[in-house]
Amino acid sequence: EEQDIRSMGGVWKKIPYTYILMIIGTLALTGFPFLSGYYSKDAIIEFAYLKGSTVGYYAAAVGIFTALLTSIYSWRLIFKTFHGKYNNKKNNLSSIQESPLIMLIPSCLLAIGAIITGILFKEIFIGSETGFWNNSILFLQITQHDHAPTWLLIITPLIVIVTIPIAYYLFVKNEGILKNAVLKNQLLYNFLINKWYFDDLYNFIFVEPIK
């Protein structure tokens, strides 16, 4: 079975149910408004910012940046897999079939959870009903109450929405932009594609000496 998304593309019409379920999962993962991932991601960034310290501001900035990266690579997966031109030279497009019910039914349940659990349980986990946790989480007496600035409330949903057309343009409509960027920054590309060479370093320090 093919696992390289570079050898896929243009298959959404062949597996429409899988495509729709993947879209729902991606929207939830990236923190699209009112889906399950939106409430947790937004709360983490808000709490970090409202810490009011250098570390808190730094953590919020990192959270926003990682939200951007998550959205880009998640939509890259969608567009490279389901859109664009079919690139698999081993298997014909006609051979691709929808997943069986034994896979679709659990996926549908997960998709339903991604849609409704955030709305249903947000008050229990991060809202006014946090008494659900009883004595497992203890708070000191509240002396002041802060509100997150408006820009912080809208920046994550804005990133999620804006990166969808950007990712489509970069990974489907005009892939040449990224290919040219790779050619011009080959050293950086190799450094990143090799995961900062951590695996090589790990093998050199820990694995090779004990062989």
Predicted regions: what they are:
Residues 27, 85-88:
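Acidic glycine-/aspartate-rich tracts in secreted/extracellular proteins
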Residues 69-76:
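Residue-level signal for the membrane-embedded core of alpha-helical transmembrane segments
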